[in-house]
């Protein structure tokens, strides 16, 4: 798939901007702070309904405005689709598909698919588990759009259950509290099992591609791997740190999750119900849910050591890039069975890499149907990514500068 046209109204720094795009490589060049990333962020938001830079929608609206509009014309498998996303302050966002009546924003998920590489990706290795959970859930929503509803259902149940635990913690725990918790345990077990099952399947798809991508980028002897750490297996401590096979924070092996990978959603549901019962006393004492996919982690491993805390800066960057490439390869596999190859976005990434990693990454992505790259100067772009150049200037695009 590829974008033919992007239009933004009151998005970030832009009152109005239009960008004509084409298949192949397009490099947007402009000094730092000029607005290149805002353009890439808008495309990424259209694909995932979330920003790679901020956790809330407020900063996406141009200061002093009440809504922002992102419009795009997308060509997918030869068919043209016009997407429009209205981002509103204080109320639900809305979408339109081919100028239809308004639909829920999440109805747009899965239509425009992107893989976005950015400096913020360092948080995938160095950050807390929420960054890695978000990575998995966003990729799942792109591949299977109804996963967004699954995650939303789980978050809703989790919020209700936590409110009940806090209420019970504030006073004496009564039989009514216990009975109500039993009901919410069932709801959360079912929603959590669906979420966990989907994540486990996705991690198994990612693992071989992660190893391949890391080897392509580095020629390193250390193999790269990813291990899903679940609270169902006592793989996380009460503060959210990963536990290895020894029960101490640290790496383990993928076999530790073998029994979970072989379980059905119904079996996982029963596992959660039992786990909630075993942890109830501690949860009532703390007033929060200690078991569930909201506390799980995706541990990234280099050789025998976790990448977090042990990888060098260069290895950390290689792992981040490899994880994004792995998601790209998974999407390509999906495209071969009826999907469509995603748009690749590389936002100010090459400036962060040494020459060797620049050239290897460029060689890998150059064959994608559409590659959008941003850079402060042309010198940051490897020769392997020859293509159209677009000059970004204050407030818009310099058509004469292309």
Swiss-Prot record:
Ligand binding (ATP): 30-37
Xref: Pfam families: SMC_N (PF02463)
Keywords: ATP-binding, Cytoplasm, DNA damage, DNA repair, DNA replication, DNA-binding, Nucleotide-binding, SOS response
PROSITE patterns: RECF_1, RECF_2
This protein's GO CC annotations: cytoplasm
Transmembrane feature ranges: none
Gene Ontology terms, MF aspect: ATP binding; ATP hydrolysis activity; single-stranded DNA binding
Gene Ontology BP, a term: SOS response
UniProt-listed Gene3D superfamilies: P-loop containing nucleotide triphosphate hydrolases, RecF/RecN/SMC, N-terminal domain
GTP-binding listed as a keyword: no
Subcellular localization: Cytoplasm
NCBIfam families tied to this protein: recf
Family, as annotated: Belongs to the RecF family.
Function: The RecF protein is involved in DNA metabolism; it is required for DNA replication and normal SOS inducibility. RecF binds preferentially to single-stranded, linear DNA. It also seems to bind ATP.
Name this polypeptide is given: DNA replication and repair protein RecF
Gene: recF
């Amino acid at each position: 798939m590829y974008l033919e046209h992007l239009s933004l109204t009151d998005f970030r720094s832009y009152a109005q901007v239009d960008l004509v795009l084409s298949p192949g490589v397009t490099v947007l060049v402009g000094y730092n702070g000029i607005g290149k990333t805002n353009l890439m962020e808008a495309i990424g938001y259209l694909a995932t309904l979330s920003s790679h830079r901020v956790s809330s929608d407020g900063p996406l609206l141009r200061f002093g405005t009440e809504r922002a509009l992102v419009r795009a014309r997308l060509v997918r498998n030869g068919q043209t689709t016009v997407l429009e996303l209205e981002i509103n302050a204080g109320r639900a966002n809305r979408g339109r598909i081919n100028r239809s009546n308004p639909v829920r924003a999440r109805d747009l998920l899965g239509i425009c698919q992107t893989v976005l590489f950015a400096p913020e990706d360092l948080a995938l290795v160095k950050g807390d588990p929420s960054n890695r959970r978000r990575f998995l859930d966003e990729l799942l929503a792109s591949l299977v759009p109804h996963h967004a509803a699954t995650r939303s259902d789980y978050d809703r149940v989790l919020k209700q259950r936590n409110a009940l635990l806090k209420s019970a913690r504030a006073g004496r725990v009564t039989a009514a509290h216990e009975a109500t918790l039993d009901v919410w345990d069932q709801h959360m077990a079912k929603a959590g099992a669906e979420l966990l099952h989907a994540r486990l399947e996705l991690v198994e798809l990612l693992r071989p591609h992660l190893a391949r991508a890391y080897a392509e980028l580095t020629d390193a002897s250390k193999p790269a791997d990813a291990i899903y750490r679940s609270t169902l297996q006592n793989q996380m401590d009460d503060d959210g740190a990963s536990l290895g096979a020894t029960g101490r924070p640290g790496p383990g092996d993928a076999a530790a999750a073998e029994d979970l990978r072989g379980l059905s959603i119904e079996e996982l549901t029963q596992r959660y119900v039992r786990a909630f019962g075993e942890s109830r006393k501690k949860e009532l004492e703390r007033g929060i849910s200690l078991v569930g996919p909201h506390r799980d982690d995706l541990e990234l491993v280099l050789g025998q050591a976790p990448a977090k805390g042990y990888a060098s800066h260069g290895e950390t960057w290689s792992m981040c890039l490899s994880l994004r490439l792995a998601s790209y390869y998974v999407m390509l596999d999906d495209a071969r069975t009826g999907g469509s190859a995603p748009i690749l976005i590389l936002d100010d990434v090459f400036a962060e890499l040494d020459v060797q990693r620049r050239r290897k990454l460029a060689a890998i992505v150059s064959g994608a149907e559409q590659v959008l790259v941003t850079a402060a100067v042309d010198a940051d772009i490897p020769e392997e990514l020859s293509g159209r150049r677009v000059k970004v200037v204050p407030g818009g695009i310099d058509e004469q500068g292309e």
